[in-house]
Swiss-Prot record:
The gene is vhuU. Ni(2+) binds at residues 21, 24. Keywords: Metal-binding, Nickel, Oxidoreductase, Selenocysteine. Signal peptide: none annotated. The lineage of its organism: Archaea, Methanobacteriati, Methanobacteriota, Methanomada group, Methanopyri. GO terms for molecular function: ferredoxin hydrogenase activity; nickel cation binding. This is F420-non-reducing hydrogenase vhu subunit U. It is an enzyme of class 1 (oxidoreductase). Coiled coil: none annotated. It comes from the Archaea. The F420-non-reducing hydrogenase vhu is composed of four subunits; VhuA, VhuD, VhuG and VhuU.
Length: 42
């Protein structure tokens, strides 16, 4: 699962650096990452 988290972190970085208007998408990614981390704890 760490690989998926790394990919999401990379996507988030790309989105934020590419266009500030896409920060909403980055916010969605944050929520997805939170869900993935919660699953890892189970």
């Amino acid at each position: 699962m760490a690989e998926k988290r790394d990919v999401l972190n990379y996507l988030e970085m790309v989105i934020r650096s590419y266009d500030i208007u896409l920060s909403c998408a980055a916010h969605v990614l944050d929520r997805v990452k939170f869900r993935i981390e919660r699953k890892d704890e189970d």
